Amino acid sequence: MKKVPGPIVLVEPLSGNTSLLIKVNEVLAVRRSRYQEIMVVETEDYGRALILDDYIQSSYYDEAFYHESLVHPAMVTHPAPRDVLILGGGEGATLREVLKHPTVEKAVMVDIDGDVVELSKRFLPQMHQGAFDSPRAEVVIEDGFVYVKRALEEGRKFDVVIMDLTDPYSSEIAKQLYTAEFINQIMKLLRGDGIMVTQAGNSFYFPEAYDMVLSAVKANFPVVAEYNVWIPSFGYAVNYILGSLKYDPRALPAEEVDKRLADRGVKTRFYTGRAHVALMNMPVYRRLR
């Protein structure tokens, strides 16, 4: 955050050479946790936003684009997801979207930073919408790497695993969770028809990091789908990579997606059958040299 003549301006780096300038009307909270600097601010164009180490993680006006695109392609592709694991997602919006599916019996959300969860509960009610208090939710404050290792030792199984972590290039916290070795552990946590999905940053500005994550997923899953969606407050299209042991999200027609959403009573603001098909058919943005 920089103070310049006039308004407060957040200078968010998109790459080492490009930044996005965001006008901030009010700083609601600032805290340095054990892991990162956390801010909750009111912005002019994006509403209330969560910022970690100068990177916007979510904002009120466009978070549905990000969270619905992260959660629902995997959840809808699986015919009956009962047990779901979320790694990251401290603001609670990913948990909120998962719990929209009545098939879910237990959603476990694991975040390393309890301060993010605490501040989100207090300052970001529109994000979590009470999801933290659901009897179907279990919130664990722990390193995801440690949790997954223990879950494997205990024989836990999940139908869907969602990785809603900081970018592989923006923070040291999550880097070990994007390796092929860790993705292999995720695969072993899944039931035989399980699905995992991860956000993978931006393929245009950080192609090497994106390809690292893509290779890690391809090394462990027979079905891999890449897709992306434009997030205005990020200043770029965020990439997602889905790995499946059985079901292919690209095989679902729009009508079937809409039917599954309707049958489950899932209400969305962005994700629909048409959006699903569009996401699965979009090219990946890469630099054209």
From Swiss-Prot:
GO terms for cellular component: cytoplasm. Keywords: Cytoplasm, Polyamine biosynthesis, Spermidine biosynthesis, Transferase. One of its GO terms (biological process) is spermidine biosynthetic process. GO terms for molecular function: spermidine synthase activity. Residues 5-245 form the PABS domain. The active site is at residue 164. Pfam families: Spermine_synt_N (PF17284), Spermine_synth (PF01564). Transmembrane segments: none annotated. Its main location: cytoplasm. InterPro entries: PABS (IPR030374), PABS_CS (IPR030373), SAM-dependent_MTases_sf (IPR029063), Spermi_synthase (IPR001045), Spermidine_synt_N (IPR035246), Spermidine_synt_N_sf (IPR037163). It comes from the Archaea. S-methyl-5'-thioadenosine binds at residues 36, 111, 143-144. It is found in: Cytoplasm. It catalyses: S-adenosyl 3-(methylsulfanyl)propylamine + putrescine = S-methyl-5'-thioadenosine + spermidine + H(+). Pathway: Amine and polyamine biosynthesis; spermidine biosynthesis; spermidine from putrescine: step 1/1. Spermidine binds at residues 67, 91. Its EC number is 2.5.1.16. HAMAP family: Spermidine_synth. Belongs to the spermidine/spermine synthase family. Homodimer or homotetramer. Catalyzes the irreversible transfer of a propylamine group from the amino donor S-adenosylmethioninamine (decarboxy-AdoMet) to putrescine (1,4-diaminobutane) to yield spermidine. This is Polyamine aminopropyltransferase. The lineage of its organism: Archaea, Thermoproteota, Thermoprotei, Thermoproteales, Thermoproteaceae.
